[in-house]
């Protein structure tokens, strides 16, 4: 189990119930948090251009936080639903696309952004496909959504001060995302051959 998966387990067991208890008093509807996540991600684009890169980073961090709490609120309030699951997965892809658009606005080369985004869209597809075939795919590969999100935040933060370093990190992230695609494809194909 990777470091991020251990952190996720700790979050889900220790932090999420407390956060969910608090947030459920603000709104017990977890879909509110799900819907707010891409709104914050979309606001990050003009924020980078017209307010400040730091404001944009804060909006992306807020978007990621909202995405992390929607499921916790759903479980805490007993409002887990197929609709919520569908909205979460679908809107995550929209948010991911908006994070990558912010990378482009920050000056990351378009081909690097395309490589990161396309691989980043294939990774969750492979998980969904594998799980529809009865396989447990979560935790397989180097760059799951959490790792990709942290990488994007780091690349954006570094791009404010040193674009060349940010480009190098974005290139490395793109390679790691595609390694994750290959890891998942190999795992799923291997399991299906059994």
UniProtKB/Swiss-Prot annotation:
Query: Where is this gene product found?
Result: Cell membrane
Pathway involvement of the protein, from the record: Lipid metabolism; phospholipid metabolism
Instruction: Name the InterPro entries for this protein.
Output: AIP_synthase, archin_ph_syn, CDP-OH_P_trans, CDP-OH_PTrfase_TM_dom, CDP_ALCOHOL_P_TRANSF_CS
Cofactor(s), names only, from the UniProt record: Mn(2+); Mg(2+)
Q: State any GO BP term from the record.
A: phospholipid biosynthetic process
Q: Where is the active site?
A: 92
Q: Does the keyword Signal apply?
A: no
Question: How is the co-factor bound, per the entry?
Answer: Binds 2 Mg(2+) or Mn(2+) ions per subunit.
The record lists Mg(2+) 2 as bound by 67, 88, 92
Q: Is Endoplasmic reticulum included in the keywords of this UniProt record?
A: no
Query: What is the recorded function of this protein according to its Swiss-Prot or TrEMBL entry?
Result: Catalyzes the formation of archaetidylinositol phosphate (AIP) from CDP-archaeol (CDP-ArOH or CDP-2,3-bis-(O-phytanyl)-sn-glycerol) and 1L-myo-inositol 1-phosphate (IP or 1D-myo-inositol 3-phosphate). AIP is a precursor of archaetidyl-myo-inositol (AI), an ether-type inositol phospholipid ubiquitously distributed in archaea membranes and essential for glycolipid biosynthesis in archaea.
- Residues annotated for Mg(2+) 1 binding in this entry: 67, 70, 88
Q: What is the lineage of its organism?
A: Archaea, Thermoproteota, Thermoprotei, Desulfurococcales, Desulfurococcaceae
For this entry, the protein name equals Archaetidylinositol phosphate synthase
Q: Which species is this record about?
A: Aeropyrum pernix (strain ATCC 700893 / DSM 11879 / JCM 9820 / NBRC 100138 / K1)
Q: Which residues cross the membrane?
A: 32-51, 58-78, 103-123, 150-170, 172-192
Pfam families per record: CDP-OH_P_transf
